From Swiss-Prot:
Belongs to the methyltransferase superfamily. RsmH family. This is Ribosomal RNA small subunit methyltransferase H. The gene is rsmH. PANTHER family: 12S RRNA N4-METHYLCYTIDINE METHYLTRANSFERASE (PTHR11265:SF0), S-ADENOSYL-METHYLTRANSFERASE MRAW (PTHR11265). One of its GO terms (molecular function) is rRNA (cytosine-N4-)-methyltransferase activity. It comes from the Bacteria.
Amino acid sequence: MHCPDKESVYHIPVMLGECLEGLRIDPDGCYVDVTFGGGGHSRAIVEKLSSKGRLYGFDQDADACRNILQDERFTFVTSNFRYLANFMDYYGEDGVDGILADLGVSSHHFDEEERGFSFRSESPLLDMRMNARAGRNAAAILNEYDASSLSALFYHYGELKQARRFAASIVHYRESLSGGLQTVGQLLEAVRGLISPREEKKQLACIFQALRIEVNDELGALQQMLEAALGCLRSGGRLVVMTYHSLEDRMVKNVLRYGTVKAPDEDSLRLYGAPQSPWQQITRKPLTASTKELSDNPRSRSAKLRIAEKI
C-alpha cells in the first residue's frame, strides 16, 4: 500500500479510558476499531491484548495508512466501516468481542486545507470527501442541486435555520460564476449577506456539516455499520460508539433502545409497547468528557459516548 509522505497529525483520542473500560477487553479477544484515524484508540487496545488477541482497524481515508500499527496482531482495512460485515466474513471471523466507533471528524481533516472541510481554510476546492477516490465532492453538490434540494439538505443534515434563504442565495450566486461555485471563499461569499455576526460560526458549521454528511453518505454508512455490528458481535460483545452531533446520536440511541435507527411512532408504542431490543444498554445516559479532558482537549466538548452489550 502506498501512503502519502506528508506528516500526519490527528487528534488526541477522546475519552480513551472510558472507551477501553466500555470494551471490557479480553486479552485473547478480537476487536474492531471502525474509525482508525490516527490510531490512538487502536494503540491502546493492542497494548491490552495477549499474543492471541486480534484487532482490525478500518479507515477509508488513504492518509490514515501512515499510522498503521506495525504489530502482527493488527490488520488495517482500507474501507468504509459500512462494509464491516463483508470484511469480517472475508477474514473468517465468526464473532468479535468488541467494536469501537469514534464518529468525529479528526483534526487532521480540518487542518488539511486542500480537503475543504473547514470554513476557516483557504482551500482552492470544496472537496470534503473522506475517500478522495470516491464520487462527487461538495462543489459538485453545490452546483448540481436545485434550491429545493439544497434547502432540504441544509435543514435535515445541518439543522440550519432559514435553510431556504441560504439555498436560494447559493443558487443565485453560483449563476454569476462562469465556472460555478468551487472554493470555500466563494461559498462564504455566497452566504455572506445572510450570516448573523453573533451566529457566524454556528451557521457556517451547520452548512459545512450538511455538505460533509451528504458527500460521504455518513448517516447511511452509520446505519449499515450499526446493523452489521449486531451480526458481527458475539453474545456478550460490546459496542462502544462516540457521537458528535444530534443526528448521529439519535440513530445510535434508537438502535440501542429499539433495535432500529428509527424510533417507533407513538401509536405503535401505545398499542404494542416498545420492541425488544437485542442490546443491553450499559450507559442509560451517554457519558461525556470530564472537566479535565474538556480543558486538555477541546474537541471532546460535544462528544457523547454510548456503550451497549449484545444480548
